[in-house]
């Protein structure tokens, strides 16, 4: 073997060894505040949060890692990495890329985002809240029914009898003859102590910087303090189901799918009262300039809520937040 051939063989081995070492070299991700190793798991989880299927999220994460290693990159900033991720998502679906940008903006914020989703029984507040939380990467989702249970433990039934009824039967426990619609009067009396608990959750979230979504029938605009409704980081929505027959059908579907302790018949027995509360909440929301969304299709409702929040964040981002870097 000639000296020239030997040199060529050594060079090829060196290149292969260098490439092999590059494949196993750790990539560091840096921001102004921290440095950490690149993690496919962390990246994949951030992608699933915006709706990418888990297997696809890991494929994208692996591909990005391999490309960085092939280019011999040992250090990359979070912003540079985010640009690469967005480009990959744009190749798949522009909507996913937009969701990723929104998710990043929310994660950057030091000030929390609080979403309140109201609506009468059966309009789908819990389903929509869960989907919005998944889309925005907000894991804290609280139902007002849970807050009501806490308030029941704090406030005696003798003092607040309507609190111990359902929102649509509270009128039965009124201690006086109401001048107006007893169903609405009872509902408001029932909701007042729950709203105190809702305001407590919102104030704590603001003070501690915790993103949260609160959903349920007790989100009554006229009962919530104006400073909370007007707080720039609080987003309030009211859900409706305009078609009464569609609203009725939802109780049957929910009872069948979730094995509720209360069968559909109980809700349908008081359907007239539920619809009166439904219409009252819609009117109250409109009077307070709160978006009312006809919840016919889950995806469309979620898109409307997320788009509204996104546009508001973009409009007031400079005034509302100080950014730190996240993936």
From Swiss-Prot:
It is an enzyme of class 2 (transferase). Residues 1-27 are annotated as: Disordered. The keyword Cell membrane does not apply. Its cofactor is a divalent metal cation. Transmembrane segments: none annotated. The keyword Ribonucleoprotein does not apply. Keywords: ATP-binding, Kinase, Nucleotide-binding, Transferase. InterPro entries: 2PKG, ATP-cone_dom, P-loop_NTPase. GO terms for molecular function: ATP binding; kinase activity; phosphotransferase activity, carboxyl group as acceptor. It catalyses: (2R)-2-phosphoglycerate + ATP = (2R)-2,3-bisphosphoglycerate + ADP + H(+). SUPFAM superfamilies: P-loop containing nucleoside triphosphate hydrolases. Residues 1-20 have a biased composition (Basic and acidic residues). Pfam families: ATP-cone. Residues 25-111 form the ATP-cone domain. Pathway: Thermoadapter biosynthesis; cyclic 2,3-diphosphoglycerate biosynthesis; cyclic 2,3-diphosphoglycerate from 2-phospho-D-glycerate: step 1/2. PANTHER family: P-LOOP NTPASE DOMAIN-CONTAINING PROTEIN LPA1 HOMOLOG 1. Belongs to the 2-phosphoglycerate kinase family. Catalyzes the phosphorylation of 2-phosphoglycerate to 2,3-diphosphoglycerate. Involved in the biosynthesis of cyclic 2,3-bisphosphoglycerate, a thermoprotectant. This is 2-phosphoglycerate kinase. The gene is pgk2.
């Amino acid at each position: 073997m000639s000296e020239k051939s030997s040199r060529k063989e050594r060079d090829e081995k060196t290149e292969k060894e260098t490439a092999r070492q590059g494949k196993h070299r750790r990539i560091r991700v840096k921001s102004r505040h921290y440095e950490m190793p690149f993690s496919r798991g962390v990246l994949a989880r951030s992608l699933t949060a915006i709706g990418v299927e888990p297997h696809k999220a890991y494929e994208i994460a692996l591909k990005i890692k391999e490309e960085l290693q092939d280019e011999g990159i040992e250090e990359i900033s979070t912003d540079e990495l985010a640009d690469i991720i967005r480009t990959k998502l744009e190749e798949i679906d522009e909507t996913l890329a937009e969701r990723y940008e929104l998710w990043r903006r929310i994660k950057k914020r030091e000030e929390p985002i609080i979403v309140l989703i109201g609506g009468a029984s059966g309009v789908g507040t819990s389903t929509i809240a869960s989907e919005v939380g998944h889309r925005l990467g907000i894991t804290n989702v609280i139902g007002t029914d849970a807050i009501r249970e806490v308030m029941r433990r704090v406030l005696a039934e003798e003092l607040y009898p309507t609190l111990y009824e359902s929102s649509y039967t509270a009128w039965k426990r009124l201690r006086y003859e109401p001048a107006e619609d007893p169903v609405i009067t009872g509902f408001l009396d029932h909701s007042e102590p729950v709203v105190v608990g809702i305001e407590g959750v919102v104030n704590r979230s603001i003070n501690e910087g915790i993103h949260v979504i609160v959903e349920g029938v007790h989100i009554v605009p006229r009962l919530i303090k104006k400073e909370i409704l007007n707080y720039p980081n609080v987003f309030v929505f009211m859900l409706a189901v305009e078609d009464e027959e569609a609203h009725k059908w939802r109780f049957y579907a929910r009872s069948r799918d979730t094995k509720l302790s209360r069968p559909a018949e109980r809700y349908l027995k008081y359907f007239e009262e539920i619809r009166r509360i439904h219409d009252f909440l819609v009117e109250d929301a409109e009077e307070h300039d709160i978006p009312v969304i006809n919840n016919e299709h889950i995806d469309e409702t979620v898109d409307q809520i997320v788009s509204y929040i996104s546009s508001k964040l973009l409009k007031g981002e400079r005034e509302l937040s100080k950014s730190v870097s996240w993936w």
